[in-house]
Design a protein with these regions (language model features):
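A glycine-rich helix N-cap at a beta->alpha junction
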Residues: 76-92
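Histidine-rich, glycine-flanked metal-binding segment
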Residues: 1-19, 404
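C-terminal cap of metal-dependent C-N hydrolases
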Residues: 284, 338-404
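His/Asp/Glu-enriched, well-ordered alpha-helical/loop segment
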Residues: 165-195, 241, 262, 267-269, ...
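Divalent metal-coordination and catalytic microenvironments
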Residues: 15, 26, 47, 51, ...
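Histidine-centered catalytic micro-motifs
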Residues: 21-32, 142-146, 203, 271
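Histidine/acidic residue-rich metal-binding segments in metalloenzymes
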Residues: 98-269
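Metal-associated gating/positioning segment near the N- to mid-region
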Residues: 13-81
């Protein structure tokens, strides 16, 4: 910045850190069709309040984002509602698998593939369709890896033993490490065979981490906040609030994922932000819905891990800002550089505060972090150079983010 330029305004940032705005490459903002849970307006407010300036939304909406027409519909919704920048994944299905080579690379961050049942009806399991998807895709594939037959058999056995809705404490046993590892191995083998860039979503197990090479730019892995912050013992305290797919697993898995943040096996951090009405979270491993809101508290939660010595703040910025831009080829975002968009977040350390329900911006109005005391605060968030969030307040309800653009990949 040229020092002789006159400032439009002066911001007191004494004692603060200025970072690139967070790029959350894994959110479910629920538009269209699931707006009782959240929408682009409410969830982008939560993002802005958390220092997240760019999000990439997943395709398992109603209807699912699996055609150009539905993608354009979602783009229009985001343009009208989103306070932060936005991008999208196109869902892979048996119906569109043979046409994935024709997807406009300027419109999407990549292809989302569900190799395992989760929320929505997008899972693809038959081998011929999977091969077609990997053969046809010209874009990065982000994949949810779990083996559904293994999970189905486990659920049947646990229902026989514990009744129709086993306690949520069994969720990690019903969706075990073996199901993740088997599916991840298959996805990696297909990516190697067809020379496709693969990003494996939400790693949950220590065993999966052995499948990744820190120096491999083709095959990469994501960690998500639920699996970094929680472990199986937290089911007793938080119940189905932390039920998600893949499941929050064991303390040894969490420790391994945290260690992989610094050795390069984890390339990005996302939230898998997936709001549900609190009434939908009643029940156990079978009946409670899977997913939790997290986009508002991802940055301050990761800064706690910085304070605990899990990773340095520079590495956190790489995982949450730089690398999402690199992996998906996002243009002019993710870095504090001349010529880049001014997506910025100002954060302050040594400023403890405890989360009350009335500070939650997500439409669902609950968080697994309620009652938690954070040591960092998001002071201000700037999206495209404009102040969107200032010390607890959305500054202008009419500001809108932009659709992100991509470099050749």
């Amino acid at each position: 910045v040229q020092p002789q330029l006159p400032p439009d305004s002066i911001i007191d940032a004494e004692g603060c850190y200025l970072l690139p705005g967070v790029i959350d490459e894994h959110v479910h903002f629920r538009d269209p069709g699931l707006t009782a849970k959240g929408n682009f307006y409410t969830e982008s407010r939560a993002a802005a309040a958390g220092g997240v300036t760019t999000v990439i939304d997943m395709p398992n909406t109603v209807p699912p984002t699996v055609t150009k027409e539905r993608l354009l519909q979602k783009i229009e919704i985001a343009q009208q509602q989103s306070l932060v920048n936005f991008g999208f994944f196109l869902g892979a299905t048996p119906d569109n698998a043979a046409r994935l080579k024709d997807v406009n690379p300027r419109l999407v961050a990549g292809i989302k593939l569900f190799m395992g049942s989760s929320t929505g009806e997008l899972q693809v399991e038959d081998r011929p369709t999977l091969r077609t998807i990997f053969e046809q895709s010209q874009l990065p594939i982000m994949v949810h890896c779990e083996d559904t037959p293994m999970i189905t058999a486990k659920m049947k056995a646990y229902k026989k033993k514990y009744g129709e809705d086993p306690h949520v404490r069994y969720h990690a046993e019903i969706r075990p490490s073996e199901a993740c590892v088997k599916s991840t191995k298959e996805a990696i083998a297909l990516a190697r065979e067809f020379n496709v860039k693969l990003h494996v979503a939400h790693i949950t197990t220590a065993a999966e981490l052995d499948l990744f090479d820190p120096n491999d730019k083709q095959i990469t892995a994501e960690a998500c906040l639920p699996h970094l912050m929680f472990a199986s013992e937290d089911y007793e305290r938080l119940g189905a609030r932390i039920k998600c797919n893949p499941a929050v697993k064991y303390d040894t898995d969490r420790a391994a994922i945290r260690a992989a943040l610094t050795d390069g096996r984890i390339r990005t951090i996302g939230t898998d932000h997936a709001p549900h009405r609190i009434s939908d979270k009643i029940g156990g491993a079978a009946k409670a819905t899977s997913g939790m809101p997290f986009v508002q508290f991802s940055l301050v939660s990761m800064l706690e891990l910085v304070d605990e010595g899990v990773l340095p703040i520079e590495r956190m910025v790489e995982l949450m800002c730089h690398n999402p831009a690199r992996v998906f080829g996002i243009e002019n975002r993710g870095f504090l550089r001349q010529g880049y968009m001014a997506d910025l977040v100002l954060i302050k350390p040594h400023s403890p505060w405890t989360l009350p329900p009335n500070r939650i911006e997500s439409k669902c109005n609950w968080s697994p972090m309620e009652g938690h005391t954070f040591n960092w605060r998001v002071m201000r968030t700037f999206v495209n150079g404009r102040l969107v969030y200032n010390k607890g307040v959305i500054t202008n309800e009419n500001l809108r983010g932009r659709m992100i653009t991509y470099m050749p990949r």
